[in-house]
Amino acid sequence: MERTYLMIKPDGVQRNLIGEIVSRFEKKGFTLIGAKLMTVTKEQAETHYAEHKERPFFGELVDFITSGPVFAMVWEGENVIATARKMMGATNPADAEPGTIRGDFGVQVAMNVIHGSDSPESAKREIDIFFDSSELNEYDKVVNRWV
């Protein structure tokens, strides 16, 4: 079963959006197998955003993601990566469709509420940055027969 890493960023946590966002993924039929409220360390942030290291906004990304708690999650389900990307909406909330998380709640590119893995490789890498394997729970849900 495919897994993805999703993170509600500090702006989403501060705006009390955790429940709303988790509910959307649960209603879609995905299974939450790991979750925690945490403060991202500078080392984790730099590893997570390593692909942007040479970009002028790298420091701002690291500062923002370490500025307050995030809600880190691992979700499992059929096509969860692509579906989560659609549910999140465009990176720039101004371009995100209404009904998507960023379209409904995003304020600006820097504060766009949520991060989600963009590929199976990214998902594995990001899950390994933020979770120990002992923090992930595999279980069967009766509802899985219906979704």
From Swiss-Prot:
Identify the cofactor(s). Answer: Mg(2+)
Quote the record's binding site residues for ATP.
9, 57, 85, 91, 102, 112
State the compartments where it is located: Cytoplasm
Q: Which residues carry this modification: Phosphoserine?
A: 122
- Name the domain of life this protein comes from: Bacteria
Q: Which reaction does it catalyse?
A: a 2'-deoxyribonucleoside 5'-diphosphate + ATP = a 2'-deoxyribonucleoside 5'-triphosphate + ADP; a ribonucleoside 5'-diphosphate + ATP = a ribonucleoside 5'-triphosphate + ADP
Principal localization reads cytoplasm
- Keyword Metal-binding on entry: yes
InterPro entries per UniProt: NDK-like_dom, NDK-like_dom_sf, Nucleoside_diP_kinase, Nucleoside_diP_kinase_AS
- Tell me which GO cellular component terms the UniProt record holds: cytoplasm
Report if keyword Magnesium is assigned. Answer: yes
Q: Which UniProt keywords apply?
A: ATP-binding, Cytoplasm, Kinase, Magnesium, Metal-binding, Nucleotide metabolism, Nucleotide-binding, Phosphoprotein, Transferase
Subunit note: Homotetramer.
HAMAP family in the record: NDP_kinase
The entry's family comment says: Belongs to the NDK family.
Q: What functional role does this protein have? A: Major role in the synthesis of nucleoside triphosphates other than ATP. The ATP gamma phosphate is transferred to the NDP beta phosphate via a ping-pong mechanism, using a phosphorylated active-site intermediate.
Protein name (record) = Nucleoside diphosphate kinase
List the source organism. Halalkalibacterium halodurans (strain ATCC BAA-125 / DSM 18197 / FERM 7344 / JCM 9153 / C-125) (Bacillus halodurans)
The organism's lineage? Bacteria, Bacillati, Bacillota, Bacilli, Bacillales
